[in-house]
Every structure is written in structure tokens, then in C-alpha cells.
Amino acid sequence: MEDGAPYGASVRESLVHVLDTARELGFRTENMDGHLGWCEYGEGDEMVAVLGHLDVVPAGDGWSCDPFGGELRGGKIWGRGATDDKGPAIASLFALAALRDSGLPIRRRIRILFGCNEEAGSDDIKYYLANGGEIPVMGFTPDGEYPVINGEKGIINVTFSHANVQTGDVRLLSIHGGTAPNVVPAHACAKLACPRELAQRLANL
């Protein structure tokens, strides 16, 4: 593991870029050892959090453009994470700048959290809390839909195993599919040992 890059160099690069942008916009920032970063605007004892994240699920195959190129087509940005969650996170940053520039008075600080491990279990938030990260009085994620979604209730990753006891003419040699636990597999592959006639029938399905 690289220093300051607990979730990989590319995620660290995204975090450094967004925090640099936030500083250029005039916001206070903090980088929590590459696990998570935040920027903040306003004064007051209480804080409202906007929880975004910069990591993405694996890009997979079948793209007609560079999945990390941010290509603009028809007024839309195409790329992995454009809607979940880089686009909403950056939109929140510029919305915060617009709010500040409007001069509208606010009673609480607004902090945008830029997570780096949401897609793989949210260890970034655990690190934030374990290292003195302030708990907000309220918060929301910017990538939801209407009507309001009242929180995800959790995730369970399960590993199954079974003794390789097989009889008959068909034997399963291997099976695999998918790139991450929270991604619908684009394809799956099974390797079978079976009589040639059956293999031909399967090939003709």
C-alpha cells in the first residue's frame, strides 16, 4: 500500500484534484491520509454533511469511449462514475461555491465529504470517525433520486463453498463471473467436462 493511497493511486489522484479545486474556490480542506477528504464553508457549532465519493466500481468492457476520459456528448458527460458519484460530488462543490457567492446567510457549517472507499465497504468513513471526524447534525448524499431514499440498510458479502462431489456424464470444472460484489455481472463463464455430443448440443443453443 502506498503512503497516502490506501485505495490505490488513481483514487488518491482524484482526491488530490478535488481538494485542490476546493482550495482554489476558497474553501477549507482536509485530507485524512488518503482515506477521505473534505471541504467546508460557513461558521457555527453545528455541521451539515454532504456525503459523496470518488471511487468507482470496475469499468468493465463494452465502452464506446474511454471510461475515465470524461467525454462530453450531447451535453452529457460519459465515463465511469459520472452519476455515481463523481458528477454529483463535483456538482455539490460548485453548488456550495454558488451558495457562498449568493451571500445567503446560513446557520450551520456545510461540509462536503469526498469518500474513497464507498463501493468496497466504506472503510473511509470508518477511518474518518476513528480519527476524530466530526459527526454532522444532519446529512445527505447527492446521488439519490426522488422520492427521498431514507438510507441504505446495509450490505452483506457472502462466500459459498461446496465439496466437489459430482457424478454422471457432466462435471463442472470451474465457474466465474463479475468484477465486484456490488455489480451485476456483464457475463459469466462455466467450464464443463461432458461427452462430445452434449457439448455440441450446448454449443447450438
Predicted regions located by residue number:
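N-terminal helical capping/dimerization or prosegment-like subdomains
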Residues: 1-51, 57-59
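Generic non-transmembrane alpha-helical segments
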Residues: 17-25, 98, 201-205
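Short, internal active-site loops enriched in acidic
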Residues: 35-37, 116-119
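Short hydrophobic/aromatic beta-strand micro-patches
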Residues: 40, 115, 193-195
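Active-site metal-coordination/substrate-binding segment of hydrolases
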Residues: 47-114, 120, 137
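Midchain, well-structured core segments that form catalytic/ion-binding scaffolds
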Residues: 119, 125-205
